[in-house]
């Protein structure tokens, strides 16, 4: 089964649901905060939702990420 998320997007959202901040995610993955925000925005746009929270809920529902 093909994933909706790229490997990096999945890494970011997996950290997001663990309560990591954008800054912490950037540090953990050795990327800039802007890059983290861009990945999050891309996923929000892909899903057609309004926020990070809605994206997380939708991704869990779609079984793209696990709690």
Question: Which residues does each PLM region occupy?
Answer:
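Helix-turn-helix DNA-binding segment
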Residues: 1-33
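Hydrophobic residues on short alpha-helical segments
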Residues: 10-14, 44, 56
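Residues within the DNA-recognition helix of helix-turn-helix
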Residues: 39-42
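Basic, Lys/Arg-enriched C-terminal extension of HTH/homeodomain DNA-binding domains
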Residues: 45-67
């Amino acid at each position: 089964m093909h994933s909706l998320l790229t490997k990096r997007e999945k890494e970011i959202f997996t950290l997001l649901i663990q309560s990591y901040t954008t800054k912490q995610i950037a540090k953990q993955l050795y990327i800039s905060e802007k890059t983290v925000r861009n990945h999050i925005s891309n996923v929000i746009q892909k899903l057609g939702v309004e926020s990070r929270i809605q994206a997380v809920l939708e991704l869990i529902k779609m079984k793209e990420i696990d709690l």
